[in-house]
Amino acid sequence: MEYKNTLLMPKTEFPMRGNLPKREPAMQEKWAEMNIYEKVQEHTKGRPLFVLHDGPPYANGDIHMGHALNKVLKDFIVRYKSMTGFSAPYVPGWDTHGLPIEQALTNKGVKRKEMTVAEFRKLCAEYAYEQVERQREQFKRLGVRADWDNPYITLEPAYEAQQIKVFGDMAKKGYIYKGQKPVYWSPTSESALAEAEIEYQDKKSASIYVAFPVKDGKNVLEGDEKYIIWTTTPWTLPANLGISVHPELEYSIVKVNDEKYIIASELFETVAKTLEWENAEVVKTVKGSELEYTVAKHPFYDRDSLVMLGDHVTTDAGTGCVHTAPGHGEDDFVVGKKYGLEVLCPVDDKGVLTNEAPGFEGLFYDKANKPITEKLEEVGALLKLTFITHSYPHDWRTKKPIIFRATAQWFASIEAFRKELIEAVAETKWVPAWGETRLHNMVRDRGDWCISRQRAWGVPIPVFYAENGDPIITDETINHVADLFREHGSNVWFEREAKDLLPEGFTHPGSPNGEFRKETDIMDVWFDSGSSHQAVLEEREDLQRPADLYLEGSDQYRGWFNSSLSTAVAVTGKAPYKGVLSHGFVLDGEGRKMSKSIGNIVVPKKIMDQLGGDILRLWVSSVDYQSDVRISDDILKQVAEVYRKIRNTFRFLLGNLDDFKPSENAVAVAELREVDRYMLVKLNDLITKVKEAYETYDFAAVYHAIHNFCTIDLSSFYLDFAKDILYIEGANHEDRRAIQTVLYDVLVALTKLVTPILPHTADEVWPYIPGVTEESVQLTDMPEAVQLDDAEALKTKWDAFMTLRDDVLKALEVARNEKVIGKSLNASITLYPTAEMKAMLESISEDLKQLFIVSEYKLGGMMDEAPADAPKYEHTAVVVAQATGETCERCWVVSETIGKDAEHETLCERCATVVKENYVK
């Protein structure tokens, strides 16, 4: 007889190799055929809603690692929620207006000057849709489950119509106004920028100290003094109309040779050192407030420079006397407005100085620095010129420096509802908790929101102008424009004349001749995506406002989190979200930012083509995503190793359940042995721990718990000793069926627990599980932890056994290294445990030699009775010897019972019995 044919070895069709790059696309096709998204919505219908609202990625180019991290995190949450009593619809979105698309078309050779705005916008829309399609396929390849056939896209007519309504609501409440104000202005984009569209980079600038002679001392000064200002933007000096001092600071009149200068007393030493003054003496001090309304002369123009009080003046740098140009700075503007100064801005859209800067007209602002500095030197006003490198705002798209420039713009007044914004921030749950402080400070400190852009590709600002210049925004015009956009899209604004965009028969007292013109500016793209709570959450039947969660990168505190909050609070008085979760950026393996120049860019597509989507997803679950995260080939290799371990665990479980029918073979919990029940306790602990981790969005805890369970609880312990019973005993042996019952519970629970993270693998495992009826594991719920009555006692006892077992394993390892034994089944062990451990061992009814995977086990005396040369460990001394007897051909155990049964002379007594009872006819 061939004894190896009597062993019940694992049998399964489930493949050992994942081959994910090939297998996943096939699985995704299967999902598409069975309409998995709709099936899940049907399955969870009627449950309470959980809405994770997708912040729309920008529709341009392939998805990068940041996109992958973001979408996969969202998918974890949505999948988990749909398996824990919620209906969790997920509608993906795209942000599709804005400058990058205009630039992409220009780069493709589109000659926009040769076509109408409407024609150019049509090309922009076509391009945007192509990009949406491209990104949609890449997101699907990640295994993200979403309503891919019905996404929201910001350029769609229904969306634009709702955005117009949001604008109209804000205007009606008095939150929208037009004003002349310095805004971030990008000469390279020729447009105003929002705070979210700027980034800081190092820039080399001139650093100059300039003297402004006093013209009128107002009886505080004698008139022969000079104010000293410091600036790094000499090009703004033609726009200087004043000097700001702090009311509470003390100022010194300093005599240097024959000159007298005015500076803040605190800065005397620094300025004296910088300007290399020798023998400088303070002749008088005055309070800043006393200098108010004194007048200085502009250094090279025949005009006054008014001295004003401003709280923005600091002693961090400079002289305490601040050059003030209301057309070129937020603080300057505020102070200038208070003192009735005009808003002078002698720089045009392209960043070129105009004829309001005589002597420098026609120069690009940056190129004007040198001639202006030379002019200052010529008139004797330049006290010092050096160059510094400092952090300076740049256009996030063109990467070029920006300027502050006063222009006529449309604004949303944040001031008008700042209090409500701050309250809304406090009512929201922030993860990480510092998110609250971050957004609170932004909302507290931010100025009014400049919402107009001088571009073509975007949603038009729905304002008309009467003949007398009055802006027209009424319920009637807003509703009419919204209806037109819903029917024709926003391009209708550029295709029709103003009168054809107004309601029929519309009249206005400011237009006696019935003539009107329309606004040509478009809205900031942050107003587009920031209106999604109205256009998507409020409009779609399957969603609701506020959403339960917004989840984006930490750059969105100043972006989408902020703009969504502003429009939602303005329109509804409440935040659009109950909770906000943010993640960090993806860096390379060394913690560097990814960039083309370094050549360290990791692309999701490459990972999916080489390793598979589930490996990328497993990586996402493994990192501390609330901070910046790292990725590299080495890191992915480690993750792939963990995946292999999880996959092999599934394969082992399936292989050993090939002949198991849960309805016929399952053993009742009460009839299981202690060690099997202990394994169920460990499984229930895992279920509890993993579900708690999912609940708190701690996916790394899920990853580690599952990995540890597979390697430590299963592989190193339970599955290791169970093989002896699973393979050797007869099919229906009670111990074998008991272990299979546990393995079955473990398999079903484990498959469900990994589903949110490894959906392809979980759905690949699912149909192989005996007795399952659901078409997909995604149509099931998370396992429930079953509390065993004696769970605590089992845990105490068997956790103690596991620590003692560790001591035994160490001893066996030493014996192997010293060539006392070959493998552990060659061993005979005698234990000399502590009193506590001895009592525990005596209470175990299971076969201890099976649990230790040795051929012979003996319990000696107490630990202090052990032979002197026996290695002592924390809980026991262990004597390891070669087991006596011969090796059984079937089970490999060393036994003195080999050949006792004459018919099976190469088998031990146990195997001979199993063979006779099960295989001999």
From Swiss-Prot:
One of its GO terms (molecular function) is isoleucine-tRNA ligase activity. InterPro entries: aa-tRNA-synth_I_CS, aa-tRNA-synth_Ia, Anticodon_Ile_BEm, Ile-tRNA-ligase, Ile-tRNA-ligase_type1, Ile-tRNA_ligase, M/V/L/I-tRNA-synth_anticd-bd, Rossmann-like_a/b/a_fold. A motif ('KMSKS' region) lies at residues 593-597. Its EC number is 6.1.1.5. GO terms for biological process: isoleucyl-tRNA aminoacylation. A motif ('HIGH' region) lies at residues 57-67. Its cofactor is Zn(2+). Monomer. ATP binds at residue 596. Belongs to the class-I aminoacyl-tRNA synthetase family. IleS type 1 subfamily. Signal peptide: none annotated. Keywords: Aminoacyl-tRNA synthetase, ATP-binding, Cytoplasm, Ligase, Metal-binding, Nucleotide-binding, Protein biosynthesis, Zinc. IleRS has two distinct active sites: one for aminoacylation and one for editing. The misactivated valine is translocated from the active site to the editing site, which sterically excludes the correctly activated isoleucine. The single editing site contains two valyl binding pockets, one specific for each substrate (Val-AMP or Val-tRNA(Ile)). GO terms for cellular component: cytosol. Binds 1 zinc ion per subunit. It is found in: Cytoplasm. HAMAP family: Ile_tRNA_synth_type1. The gene is ileS1. Catalyzes the attachment of isoleucine to tRNA(Ile). As IleRS can inadvertently accommodate and process structurally similar amino acids such as valine, to avoid such errors it has two additional distinct tRNA(Ile)-dependent editing activities. One activity is designated as 'pretransfer' editing and involves the hydrolysis of activated Val-AMP. The other activity is designated 'posttransfer' editing and involves deacylation of mischarged Val-tRNA(Ile). This is Isoleucine--tRNA ligase 1. Zn(2+) binds at residues 888, 891, 908, 911. It is an enzyme of class 6 (ligase). It catalyses: tRNA(Ile) + L-isoleucine + ATP = L-isoleucyl-tRNA(Ile) + AMP + diphosphate. Pfam families: Anticodon_1, tRNA-synt_1, zf-FPG_IleRS. L-isoleucyl-5'-AMP binds at residue 552.
